[in-house]
Curated annotation (Swiss-Prot):
Involved in the differentiation of bipolar cells, the last neurons of the retina to form. Together with other retinal homeobox proteins, acts as an effector of a cellular clock which, depending on cell cycle progression, establishes the generation of distinct retinal neuronal cell types. This is Visual system homeobox 1. SMART domains: HOX. The keyword Transport does not apply. It is found in: Nucleus. Residues 39-46 are annotated as: Octapeptide motif. Residues 1-33, 111-154, 273-344 are annotated as: Disordered. Its main location: nucleus. A motif (Nuclear localization signal) lies at residues 146-150. Residues 1-12, 111-126, 273-284, 303-313, 331-344 have a biased composition (Basic and acidic residues). It comes from Xenopus laevis (African clawed frog). GO terms for cellular component: nucleus. GO terms for biological process: regulation of transcription by RNA polymerase II; retinal bipolar neuron differentiation. Residues 210-263 form the CVC domain.
Length: 344
């Protein structure tokens, strides 16, 4: 049996065959393509293999029968990692068998496009994950920016505004709504800005008092704030302690602030009384002297004109009546004088 017959028989059976020395000589006679030098594990270990591999030619080599180290492949190029086996086969002695990956199931070569396909999928998955993470980060950043409170523009006070605010703060640390509105008209500031300024000024004052160590003043300050907020009157004990003076009282600062507030209210009441008296006097003047227009207010001008007209009408009617009565008296006197003359 020749080497070609062995190759055809091995291809039909699908088994690995190891050629003998005689077959090697006949293969040399037929050409370099029939040279069979194998390096099977069984031959390397010195064992006789029942199944012998055939030699497979490579189509990419020079000529149809050219082999690498005595072994050629027909199914294409060598798979990755088996190049050193071909180099090792050239150093093996003749008669050794060849272990080929095409006939062993666990050494089957995988196509390159499979690796490329899996790598592309992996890259796509990674890019998708990165895009999802990037979108999440963008959403978190946008939500954080929306939740972040925008800082209001800081109000810059002028010297005139600060002077007015300090004056009102020295008068009362807790101004009511009416006082804040009046101060807003003077300083041309919003009422809420004035309220915030007073809050900050009170905090600054408390901090300064704490640094000085005046704890009693801080206690009085807290009591005064509670009194103003809840409309609580000043206790009688504190008022009675101020009979000998503010210095000997138990709460001098609180009594001083109370005195200021009382003075302000009394001043307002006095102003109201003065205005009421002036109004009463002007009305009396209008009734007594209807022709005088110097003391008339523009608010009651029309009313005073009506009153003066009515009084003028009344005066004219009374004058007529007086004239009539005087004429009657004169006529009676004349008649009496005539009667006396006739008697004589």
């Amino acid at each position: 049996m020749t080497g070609r017959d062995d190759i055809s028989e091995a291809k039909s059976k699908g088994k690995i065959l190891a050629p003998s020395v005689g077959n090697e000589k006949s293969g040399r006679l037929h050409g370099p393509a029939m040279r069979s030098k194998g390096f099977a594990i069984t031959d390397l270990l010195g064992l006789e293999a029942e199944l012998q591999p055939p030699s497979i030619s490579l189509p990419n080599c020079e000529g149809p029968g050219v082999s690498l180290g005595g072994v050629s492949l027909t199914n294409g190029s060598l798979p990755l990692g088996l190049g050193f086996l071909c180099g090792f086969a050239s150093q093996q002695p003749p008669g050794t068998t060849c272990l080929l990956p095409t006939h062993i199931p666990f050494l089957q070569p995988r196509p390159d496009h499979h690796y490329l396909h899996t790598s592309d999928k992996h890259k796509e998955n990674i890019s998708d994950d990165d895009s999802i993470l990037g979108d999440k980060n963008d959403l978190k950043a946008s939500s954080a920016q929306s939740k972040r409170k925008k800082r209001r523009h800081r109000t810059v006070f002028t010297a005139h505004q600060l002077d007015e605010l300090e004056k009102s703060f020295n008068e009362a640390h807790y101004p009511d709504v009416y006082a804040r509105e009046m101060l807003a008209l003077k300083t041309e500031l919003p009422e809420d800005r004035i309220q915030v300024w007073f809050q900050n000024r009170r905090a600054k004052w408390r901090k300064r008092e704490k640094c000085w160590g005046r704890s009693s003043v801080m206690a009085e300050y807290g009591l005064y704030g509670a009194m103003v907020r809840h409309s609580i009157p000043l206790p009688e004990s504190i008022i009675n302690s101020a009979k000998n003076g503010l210095v000997g009282s138990c709460a001098p600062w609180l009594l001083g602030m109370h005195k200021k507030s009382v003075d302000i209210t009394s001043k307002v009441d006095a102003d109201d009384l003065v205005t009421e008296r002036s109004r009463g006097e002007s009305q009396v003047r209008d009734f007594t002297n209807p022709h005088s227009e110097s003391h008339r207010s523009p608010r009651h001008h029309s009313h005073s004109m009506d009153i003066s007209e009515e009084r003028a009408i009344d005066l004219s009617s009374t004058a007529k009546q007086e004239n009539q009565s005087s004429g009657r008296h004169n006529s009676i006197r004349d008649s009496q004088s005539d009667f006396t003359d006739s008697d004589h």
